[in-house]
Amino acid sequence: MNKLPIISLILLLVAGCIEDFDLNPGSAVPKMVVEALITNKPGPYLIRLTESHTGKFVDPDFSNIDDAKGIINAEIIISDDVNQVDTLVPMVFNRDEYLYNYRLGYYKIIYDGSGNIIDTVYWKYPVEFNPERGFYMTTHLRGIPGRTYFLKIVSEGKEYDSHSFMPEVPDIDSLGYIKKIMEKDGQEYYVPLIYFSEPQGIKNYYLIQLEEEINSRLFSETNWRFSILSDEFLESYVNGLNISLGSNPRNFEYPEYWAGDYIYVGLSSLTKEAYDFYNSLLLQFKNDGGAYQLSPGSPPTNMSNGALGFFRASAISERKIKIPYSFE
């Protein structure tokens, strides 16, 4: 006798939960997105400024999507805690200033007032560089572990600030690799191993890269070449860590190496804030939109005034090895 009222109540509750709601993402005001990195390697260091935008995201291969609008005509200054100051300049390639050699690539020779050669500068970036993409570069700054760096950006009358400490990084003692067999065809391939001493008594966070920093910032590939690491479960000596066991987004896999290939590994120091930033990005990349997934949102930032992105200072330790052919 009571079934009908109960069913009616359920239908009423369900109907009450259905309401058209227009999110209207296109009305969101664009925010500045900052990609900024300083390392202990020789510069110049790159900073990219773009505008955020909203819209549908339907391409699972997000590595090939880069339609962000660059922010130009910004004033960018980086300084440190010992009063070293550098004003960045737009990154533009002027082909007329450079010579070309098929082994050396593009380079230019710097002369003093007497015509003596004092330096040779090599262009290690893509020559098809569009200044509208929002890249800027330092002119003389050199990153040093243990220092704190300050970033100031002025664009369209607004100021954005940040600072980042550069932690020390342990040296990579050596690299190795182990052989794997593909299930589908039985081919042999290799995955890299890393060996290093892990400082004890302090919290350490790392970013492991399987591609040099300049390439990973300017080019996109379908392979996942990054891994973030906390020292929570690391022993005092990291004895052959299998990098390919790291967490990777959907539709991306760690690269497979073959005989004759070179393996590059970079170990970068991270602050806790930088680790949290990358971890948040990774969680977003792995989000499949399911009912039990976290709601999409912007990752944490160390930028002020509502800007997105992150300003990172990292020391880098690097190694490279070649996987020999069996007859070598």
PLM features per residue range, with description:
Residues 2-9:
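Sec-dependent signal peptide recognition
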Residues 11-12, 42:
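Local alpha-helix boundary/kink/capping signal
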Residues 14-16:
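C-terminal motif of bacterial Sec signal peptides marking the signal peptidase cleavage site
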Residues 18-328:
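A sequence/structural signal for flexible, mid-protein segments enriched
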